[in-house]
């Protein structure tokens, strides 16, 4: 489902917009309203975040929201409600979760429940393909997409293994450290996308490469959309919620970002762009949104 939605965006001469929001901030109902608002503003795919007590790869903005959800006892059943809401709103829902909550819930059980709720798959930022046997088997059985991450520090062997194991898209993390919005979009992301596409071609698949981390406005979205198949935005959406702008703020941000990915243009989507040349280089190895 995810690959088809990105295919559809590319047929329109643009990258896909992928929004991330966690369930449970400021409460479950308000977070689901905001998630749906992201779709109404133009998001093609929504990453629905699972609250976790030790989100080591998340920056302070996302951690602040997730901490509230964890203290309130928000869990995977609430996440599945959000999945249903996104599917009903016409976007493609994927869950983004650290691996521990999925193991505790039961890998096969979660795969079944996610599929039944209309979910397309899952992004697992702290799970590498080598250690994902149970999830690979469960996702094969249910037809769910499984999205693994690569970073500028990834070796060619790691890129190849990730390209071979992923389904839906490959998540290219453009900077190192924890997640959060950036003032500029560095050129490390473009280099990583090119390397990942080479790995995908070598293993004989046709996966898309989507870039996460750092984008906070439509202009930055246009920069990333010039060389990526999808633009992933997380912290900027969460900031709208933390600052009290709620669903209306999320909807407006989505509209700005959606306009940005459309500005990149079909010709730039076809090949790597040099539009970010000269901007400060990103650090190496960050994962998240």
Describe the predicted segments one by one.
Residues 59-94, 138-147, 151, 188-206, ...:
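Alpha-helix-loop-beta-strand connector modules within alpha/beta enzyme cores
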Residues 194-207, 216-289:
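Alpha/beta catalytic cores of nucleotide-metabolism and tRNA/nucleoside-modifying enzymes
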Residues 48-53, 121-123, 128, 171-180, ...:
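Glycine-rich phosphate-binding active-site loops on the catalytic face of alpha/beta enzymes
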Residues 22-27, 96-105, 128-129, 150-154, ...:
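Glycine-rich beta-to-alpha transition loops that act as phosphate-gripper elements at the mouths
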Residues 31-37, 155-163, 215-231:
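Catalytic cores of alpha/beta
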Residues 17-21, 46-48, 93-97, 122-124, ...:
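Hydrophobic faces of well-ordered beta-strands that scaffold small-molecule active sites
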Residues 1-4, 53-62, 71-81, 103-108, ...:
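Active-site-adjacent beta->alpha loops and helix N-cap segments on the catalytic face
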Residues 1-20, 83:
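N-terminal amphipathic alpha-helix/helix-capping segment at the start of soluble metabolic enzymes
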